[in-house]
Design a protein with these regions (language model features):
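Short alpha-helical transmembrane segments in multi-pass integral membrane proteins
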Residues: 1-19, 77-142, 188-240, 297-363, ...
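N-terminal transmembrane alpha-helices
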Residues: 6-44, 60-72, 76, 80, ...
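Transmembrane helical elements of multi-pass membrane transporters/channels
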Residues: 17-36, 138, 172, 201-205, ...
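Residue-level hotspots within pore-lining transmembrane alpha-helices
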Residues: 24, 28, 32, 62-66, ...
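Helix-terminus/linker motif at the lipid-water interface of multi-pass membrane proteins
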Residues: 31-50, 119-126, 182-189, 250-277, ...
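Small-residue-rich hydrophobic transmembrane alpha-helices
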Residues: 49-109, 146-165, 271-335, 367-389, ...
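Short runs within selected transmembrane alpha-helices of multi-pass transporters and secretion channels
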Residues: 70, 139-157, 165-173, 194-209, ...
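Structural signal for membrane-spanning alpha-helices in multi-pass inner-membrane proteins
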Residues: 111, 154, 180, 184, ...
């Protein structure tokens, strides 16, 4: 692959060079979970789909940990390279790898020792717990691959290898789809088979990503001599906003499950599983746009080329709005088709699902711009502003509206929580952008 100079290449050309590989690479999370959801909903049924939604939070935390270390470390690496600092790749990559191994072991220990209490806390019931146990059997030993798939992708994008990151996602995703069908239909392996297919796909994904380390243009080197534990705090600080996004999403799913059980029963969680899976696809696209801009923004920030950063910002925001509008329109035009992809519902349940999809999908019109703004602020080393956006849109506003509005207007109010939170956050994002326009101030 041609090795381009991100500080000199025309901005639009550099952005497009990263866009499709970044989008396809970030789709890996949604591919694994989306395929599982469709297969489980159609093959096993609504209760199994509700069980899958219960395990979303820990799975998102695993991927989020990879983003924490990968994006956090690679942003600092790119800024350091823009300033011509020596050994930046070795220092940050080695720190991220060692941290990832340690954190994966901690997660595995917690879920092995405290599995039942954790799942009951997340909302598992007597109806769903057996499905959850079957699904999590392959997931727990596969935790390192959840973390390292997203972590290595981030470093590869910043090492000018977006196509290798894309190849890993495609190979893992396609294999996951094939194995999902084989394990669930001919072999009738149920939830265990769906989960096993996902983990095998992740193993292949990581294996393909690791081929970059043998490439001639690889500058990422693992070296214990360059391990600097003091950098761990810097990596966490840099990557925490994007990690908190995944944490916030996990918490929000948990809160939604509580409210939906209260107002709708188990079918409410099934409907939300349809929405959250489709939302995950949209968010993956938004993250892809943001991550296409991230290495260009960080490298030019380190080099002090601020006009180029503003051009990247405009391209990213416009692209995010277009993607969001497409999802919003789809939610208004074909809500029933979207629901039918995942599971067959009764007439009354489909009525509720259609209303929920139409309301919730209006959030995508604003969500893409907010996610891009959050990642943009992180790329110009303004993690506090990025963190504020994350907390406001992901936990504070959504959580407050989620509990207040249903009490005022009934159960339909649950579905307005995210659209209203995203709309208000857009206004805050505009204010923060105006504050950050003079990025020379640091």
């Amino acid at each position: 692959m041609k090795n381009i100079d991100l500080t000199k290449e025309p901005v639009r050309k550099a952005f497009m060079h990263y866009l499709i590989p970044a989008v396809l690479a970030t789709m890996v999370t949604s591919i694994y979970i989306l395929v599982d959801t469709i297969m489980i909903g159609n093959r096993i049924g609504a209760d199994a789909l509700a069980g899958l939604n219960i395990v979303f939070p820990p799975i998102m935390i695993f991927f989020g940990t990879g983003n924490l270390l990968g994006i956090g470390g690679s942003v600092l690496m790119s800024v350091a390279l823009g300033r011509n600092e020596q050994n930046a790749q070795k220092k940050y990559f080695t720190t991220a790898v060692i941290s990832g191994i340690f954190i994966a072991l901690v997660y595995m220990f917690i879920l092995i020792v405290f599995f039942n209490p954790v799942m009951r806390f997340l909302g598992a019931s007597d109806v769903t717990i057996s499905y959850i146990k079957d699904y999590m059997k392959p997931v727990i030993p596969g935790i390192p691959f959840f973390i390292f798939s997203s972590m290595i992708q981030a470093f590869l994008r910043n090492d000018k290898a977006p196509k290798t990151a894309m190849a890993g996602s495609l190979c893992g995703g396609i294999l996951n789809i094939i194995l999902d069908y084989i394990f669930m239909y001919p072999l009738n392996m149920g939830m265990f088979g769906a989960s096993l297919a996902s983990v095998i796909g992740l193993v292949v994904n990581v294996a393909v990503l690791c081929t970059h380390f043998f490439a001639r243009n690889n500058s990422l080197k693992f070296s214990l001599k360059n391990l600097q534990l003091r950098l761990f705090a810097d990596v966490i600080k840099s990557g925490f906003p994007v990690f908190l996004t995944d944490i916030a999403s996990s918490v929000l799913i948990f809160l939604f499950n509580i409210q939906l059980l209260k107002y709708y029963g188990v079918i409410g969680i099934t409907i939300y599983s349809i929405i959250s899976n489709t939302s995950l696809t949209a968010v993956s696209l938004f993250n892809g746009v943001s991550q296409a801009a991230q290495p260009i923004t960080a490298m030019n920030y380190g080099a002090g080329k601020y006009d180029r950063i503003k051009k990247v910002f405009r391209l990213g925001v416009i692209t995010s709005i277009i993607v969001g509008a497409a999802f919003t329109i789809a939610g208004f035009i074909i809500p029933e088709r979207i629901a039918n992809i995942f599971v067959k519902l009764s007439e009354s349940d489909m009525f509720n699902a259609k209303k929920a999809i139409m309301i919730y999908f209006s959030a995508f019109l604003f969500m893409g711009a907010n996610i891009f703004m959050q990642n943009y602020l992180q790329s110009i080393v303004k993690p506090l502003l990025s963190l504020i956006i994350c907390v406001i849109r992901g936990i504070v506003l959504s959580g407050i509206i989620l509990f207040i509005l249903p009490a005022l207007i009934g159960k339909i109010g649950i579905w307005f929580a995210v659209p209203l939170a995203e709309a208000v956050t857009v206004l805050i994002s505009i204010i923060f952008y105006k504050r950050s326009r003079d990025i020379k101030s640091g």
